[in-house]
Amino acid sequence: MNKVIFIINDGVYPYHTGGMEVFNYHLIKSLSAEMPICYIASQEYDFDSAKYVRVAPLKPIKIFTPLWMFLYLMFHPEFKRVVLSFSAAHWLVWRIYELAIRTLRLKATIVIHYGKTVPPDHFSIYSKFFRSAENIVAVSEDIKNNYDAAYGINCKVVYPLIPFTKADKDSSYYRVKYHVPIDSNVIAMVGSLKGMKNPQRIIEALCLFDKEELVKYKPHVVYAGAGPMMEELKFLVESKGLSEYVSFLGLIPNPQIREIMAMADAYLIASDFEGTSVSLLEAMYNSKAVVASNVPGLRDMISNGENGLLYEVDSPEQLKECIIELLKSKPDADRLGRAARYSYDLRYDYKDVLNAYKDLLR
C-alpha cells in the first residue's frame, strides 16, 4: 500500500479549533490505524500509528512548510502521495506546492475547505496548482460547483465528518456545570468568534426584544469559542444591558462540544459563507433545532421550515423572528430537531468518509 504524507503545519486540533483542523485531526487518526501515514507539522500530535516529521516553526510557516516538504520528499522517495488542505493563504504558498508536486512527480490529493473561490488576479497560478493534483476533494456541493466552474476541474465531494458522540448527562447537569440559567432557552453558537462568522448578529437580534419578550421567551445565548471579536462582543453585551442573557464559555475542547449541544435548545450559525460546517453537522446529529444564515454552504444543508430555519445574513430582524418562532412552540422546535437528525442520517456517514479517502489514497 502507498505511503501517504499529510502536510498540516500546525493546523490541526487541539492547536487550532476550526472545522478543517478538527476534521484533519480525526481523519489522520482514523486512517493511520489502517494505512501507513506520515505527517509534516511543527508540533507532534497523539497519532499513535502515524510517523511525525518535524518542520521548524519558522515564520511565515505557511511558506516555509512547502519548502520543507520538498526537501524531505527529495530524500524519501517512498512517499509518493501527499494530502494538502486548501484554504485562505497567499498565492505563493500554492505556487511552491505546485512546483514541488510536479518536480517530484507526486500524486497529490487537494482538499478544498475554503468556501469562496480564490481571487481572480492569480487565476493561472491556482489553475496550475489544482491541475497538478491527481485528486481534488471539495467539502461541499457548493464548493465543488464554484471551483469546477472556475477552473475546469472535477472535484469529488467528501463531507468533513468526524465521529460524533452524544453527551451522557442531561441538559440541567451541563447548565449547572457551565453556569447557565436552568430555566432559560439556550441558543448555542459554536466556533471561532471572528468577522465572517457574524457572532454579533444574535446580540443585535436580542437588542430588538422588548422587556416583555425577554421575560416571556427567556433567550440565553451561549458562545462556545474564542477569537478576535471576544472583547468586542463582551463590551457590546455589557453596554446593551444584556449580560444576564449571554454566556461566554471561551475555548471548549472538541470532545466537550457534545455537552454544549446537550444543554442547548437551539443552535445558531450566522456565517457569511461556509463549506460544510462541522459544528452544524454536530447540531444536526444531536437533533437540535437549527437557525442558519441563508448563505452558500448552509442552505445546502438546511431547508427553511423543513429541518431548520433560515434568515438573511444581515438581518437581525429576521433572526429575531426565527428565534421567537422556535421558542414559542417546543413541539415545533422538536419537530425541526428530529428533521435535522433525519437529514443527517440520510446524507452523512463517517464510514463513507473514511472509505472515500482510502479509495483516493490507495
Stretches found by the model and what they are:
Residues P181-K197, I203-L206, V222:
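Conserved donor-binding/catalytic core segment of Leloir-type glycosyltransferases
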Residues N304-G305, L309-P316, E325-P331:
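Conserved acidic donor-binding segment of nucleotide-sugar-dependent glycosyltransferases
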Residues A167-V180, K211, A356:
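A short helix/loop element that forms part of the nucleotide-sugar donor recognition site in Leloir-type
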Residues A289-A292:
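Short hydrophobic beta-strand element within catalytic cores of glycosyltransferases
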Residues L251-I252, E259-A264:
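Short alpha-helical donor nucleotide-sugar binding micro-motif in glycosyltransferases
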Residues D272:
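Aromatic "clamp/platform" in nucleotide-sugar-dependent glycosyltransferases that forms part
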Residues Y245, Q318, E325, D332-R347, ...:
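A short, well-ordered alpha-helix in the C-terminal region of glycosyltransferases
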Residues D142, L161:
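Carbohydrate-associated surface elements
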